[in-house]
Amino acid sequence: MASGILLNVKEEVTCPICLELLTEPLSLHCGHSFCQACITANHKKSMLYKEGERSCPVCRISYQPENIQPNRHVANIVEKLREVKLSPEEGQKVDHCARHGEKLLLFCQEDSKVICWLCERSQEHRGHHTFLMEEVAQEYHVKLQTALEMLRQKQQEAEKLEADIREEKASWKIQIDHDKTNVLADFEQLREILDREESNELQNLEKEKEDILKSLTKSETKMVQQTQYVRELISDLEHRLQGSMMELLQGVDGIIKRIENMTLKKPKTFHKNQRRVFRAPDLKGMLDMFRELTDARRYWVDVTLAPNNISHAVIAEDKRQVSSRNPQIVYQSPGTLFQSLTNFNYCTGVLGSQSITSGKHYWEVDVSKKSAWILGVCAGFQSDAMCNIEQNENYQPKYGYWVIGLQEGVKYSVFQDGSLHTPFAPFIVPLSVIICPDRVGVFVDYEACTVSFFNITNHGFLIYKFSQCSFSKPVFPYLNPRKCTVPMTLCSPSS
């Protein structure tokens, strides 16, 4: 019933010209109301064809423009009517026009709306292309199906983008957490260095104090005894001077000689300006070295060993490990480091598979538990030719070798170019290594022509650095396990 009342009210406030709810309603003297735009257009048309005669479009009663009045009462009704919602039952009647109550059978192409036959004849849809819904449903079904497929593709792309950003987010989190772990570990190493230096310095000072105080205590005891001896002599002389003549002269010459010959012994002292003065560790140098290693590790490359046909070298299946097959080797001078390497040493040397022709490259080699090894970089060699060499003359920078090595478990050395007197034998320089490295880092800066070796076991301290290297051709990582059967292992960047 309420719906019927609403429909009746709608009819009363519907413009007779456009068949829409009144917009800015104006009422004529006859009582009929129209939209302001509709009555104005009608007025202009009347002026064109009827020579100034104006009449109501409904009842044809003439009117004067000055008699047209805004109808605020009707405007308020229209406004309230627009706010009113239909009942659920009425809302379910989707197949009928909400404005006219007629069945929805047509489709307006311009407005893309389903309309009734009265809507088609209204001012809103006049001149538009309209079709029966059955005529266009299949066409738009195909279009919507195509649009649906496009949306599904977009959905897949959106899901992939979502997955990519999540993966990148997770990757960044892992990377930064890894960097945080490295920072904590690096600074923990620095603290260990400082703690060790502090402990060593305090121990040295404590030992110095014990030694000095022990020596001074002995001197103090002797000085106390010497003072007591002088006091006793003084007491004896005072007693003689106060006694009888016989007591005065009895053994007087002996006493006088003892006093004249007596020499006071001076205590052993320590000059403060000659003692060892404590100096704080070179923290700047330590930090510079730490930064150098940190910078080098940014260029860590995953080195693997190149296949070879050398009979004395055994390369593991993963191409990261090399060991010596035959430990038997004879030295002409067993007590002299690296002075009589036989061709066996060359036959156990292997190259990394990656050539270095530019840029910066870093890798680490595990040499733990080995008593002998040689490592660094090499400008390449022919295996067969190398095995025919009976001496170690090729271990020189001028022949393309920038290497350091270990012999007899404790002797570390670096190979330099031979002197003018011995040009064919390398000049072997002993290296001072406080803590034996279980892991050695190698850093090559091709443009700077440098090769650096770091003791990773000892907080990355620099072992040795080749400068002004003449890289005239590609160089390769070089590993030589020598006579020791314990393998050398290339460490992965993630280790």
From Swiss-Prot:
UniProt GO molecular function: pattern recognition receptor activity; ubiquitin-protein transferase activity; zinc ion binding
Residue list for modification N-acetylalanine: 2
Gene Ontology, cellular component aspect: nucleus; P-body
Catalytic activities: S-ubiquitinyl-[E2 ubiquitin-conjugating enzyme]-L-cysteine + [acceptor protein]-L-lysine = [E2 ubiquitin-conjugating enzyme]-L-cysteine + N(6)-ubiquitinyl-[acceptor protein]-L-lysine
CDD domains according to UniProt: Bbox2_TRIM5-like, RING-HC_TRIM5-like_C-IV, SPRY_PRY_TRIM5
UniProt-annotated location(s): Cytoplasm; Nucleus
Residue ranges occupied by any B30.2/SPRY domain in the UniProt entry: 283-495
Chain intervals annotated as zinc finger (B box-type): 92-133
EC number, UniProt record: 2.3.2.27
Annotated Pfam families: SPRY (PF00622), zf-B_box (PF00643), zf-RING_UBOX (PF13445)
Main location: cytoplasm
Residues found modified as Phosphoserine: 87
Keyword tags: Acetylation, Antiviral defense, Autophagy, Coiled coil, Cytoplasm, Immunity, Innate immunity, Metal-binding, Nucleus, Phosphoprotein, Transferase, Ubl conjugation, Ubl conjugation pathway, Zinc, Zinc-finger
Post-translational modification: Degraded in a proteasome-independent fashion in the absence of viral infection but in a proteasome-dependent fashion following exposure to restriction sensitive virus.
SUPFAM superfamilies assigned: B-box zinc-binding domain, Concanavalin A-like lectins/glucanases, RING/U-box
Zinc-finger ranges (RING-type): 15-60
Coiled coil: 137-225
Example GO BP: regulation of lipopolysaccharide-mediated signaling pathway
Recorded metabolic or biological pathway in which this protein acts: Protein modification; protein ubiquitination
Family the entry assigns: Belongs to the TRIM/RBCC family.
Function summary: Capsid-specific restriction factor that prevents infection from non-host-adapted retroviruses. Blocks viral replication early in the life cycle, after viral entry but before reverse transcription. In addition to acting as a capsid-specific restriction factor, also acts as a pattern recognition receptor that activates innate immune signaling in response to the retroviral capsid lattice.
Domain remark from Swiss-Prot or TrEMBL: The B box-type zinc finger domain and the coiled-coil domain contribute to the higher and low order multimerization respectively which is essential for restriction activity. The coiled coil domain is important for higher order multimerization by promoting the initial dimerization.
Subunit structure: Can form homodimers and homotrimers. In addition to lower-order dimerization, also exhibits a higher-order multimerization and both low- and high-order multimerizations are essential for its restriction activity. Interacts with BTBD1 and BTBD2. Interacts with PSMC4, PSMC5, PSMD7 and HSPA8/HSC70. Interacts (via B30.2/SPRY domain) with HSPA1A/B. Interacts with PSMC2, MAP3K7/TAK1, TAB2 and TAB3. Interacts with SQSTM1. Interacts with TRIM6 and TRIM34. Interacts with ULK1 (phosphorylated form), GABARAP, GABARAPL1, GABARAPL2, MAP1LC3A, MAP1LC3C and BECN1.
Protein's UniProt name: Tripartite motif-containing protein 5
Organism: Macaca fascicularis
